Regions:
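Short acidic (Asp/Glu) and glycine-rich catalytic loops that position anionic groups and cofactors
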Residues: 33-34, 54-61, 100-108, 159-164
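Terminal amphipathic helices with adjacent charged low-complexity linkers/tails
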Residues: 65-126
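Short hydrophobic/aromatic-rich motifs at helix boundaries and adjacent loops
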Residues: 25-26, 97-98, 155
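Non-catalytic terminal/interface segments that mediate subunit docking, oligomerization
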Residues: 118-184
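Conserved catalytic cores of soluble enzyme domains
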Residues: 1-89
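Short capping/connector residues at structural and topological boundaries
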Residues: 34-36, 41-45, 50, 55, ...
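Short, exposed beta-strand "edge-strand" segments with a Pro/Gly-rich flavor and a Y/T-containing core
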Residues: 39-44, 61-68, 111-120, 165-172
Length: 184
C-alpha cells in the first residue's frame, strides 16, 4: 500500500507486486521527484500530478486501487483478501450473503437495448448476476472499456472480465488488453 511518498529505488518494489493500493492526495510513487525534474528539464510539475493516486490509477495503470484515506486503504485490502485464497494450496473463502443462487434476474431483460447501436452499462449486468450485486473493481479507473473485477456467485469467489460498451463501445485497445492480462 502506498500511503505516503515512495521515491527512487523504493518505488521498484510496489511495481513488482500483484496489487497496489494508493491513497489519494498522500500516496506518491515516482523514480525522480519534481525538484530533480525541474533542475534537469526545466519542467515544473507537482508531486500529485507526477506520481499521485489519480495519475497511477487513471493514466499510467501502475496502481490498481485508490483509497480516500489510510483507513479506507486498509479496509479495501481486507475486502480484496476476502476474495483470495491464503496460499496456492487453499481455495478462496466461500462467503454466503443470503442471495438465492436460483433467483431470476428480470432486469437482464431491459439492460441491453434492442438497438444494437446503443450502448449499455455492463456494470448493470454484473450487479444483476452477482451475489447481492456486489463486486470489487480491479484497475477500475484505468482503461474503462474493459471491466476487471472480483465478485461472488453462490458465495464462491470469481474473477470477471467484460467489455464495457459505455466506454469506446467496448472496443479493445492496448491499455485494456494489458489490464485484462494483468488481471488473469
Amino acid at each position: 500500500a502506498i500511503m505516503g511518498p515512495c521515491a527512487g529505488g523504493a518505488v521498484y518494489s510496489p511495481a513488482l507486486t500483484d496489487f497496489i493500493f494508493q491513497v489519494n492526495k498522500t500516496g506518491k510513487m515516482f523514480i525522480t521527484g519534481p525538484d530533480v525534474i525541474k533542475s534537469v528539464t526545466g519542467e515544473q510539475i507537482d508531486a500529485e500530478k507526477l506520481g499521485g493516486a489519480m495519475t497511477h490509477n487513471r493514466v499510467s495503470g501502475v496502481a490498481h486501487f485508490m483509497a480516500s484515506d489510510d483507513t479506507d486503504c486498509i479496509n479495501q485490502i481486507r475486502r480484496l483478501l476476502s476474495y483470495l485464497p491464503s496460499n496456492f494450496r487453499d481455495s478462496a473463502p466461500t462467503i454466503f450473503n443470503g442471495d438465492d443462487p436460483n433467483r431470476i434476474a428480470d432486469q437482464l431483460d431491459t439492460i441491453i437495448p434492442d438497438n444494437p447501436n446503443k450502448a449499455y452499462d455492463m456494470y448493470d449486468v454484473i450487479k444483476a448476476i452477482t451475489d447481492g450485486g456486489e463486486y470489487m473493481d480491479y484497475m477500475g479507473m484505468y482503461a474503462p472499456n474493459m471491466i476487471t473485477c472480483f465478485a461472488r456467485f453462490n458465495g464462491r469467489s470469481v474473477g470477471i472480465i467484460a467489455n464495457q460498451p459505455k466506454a469506446m463501445a467496448g472496443c479493445m485497445d492496448i491499455n485494456c488488453s494489458d489490464k485484462a492480462a494483468r488481471f488473469i
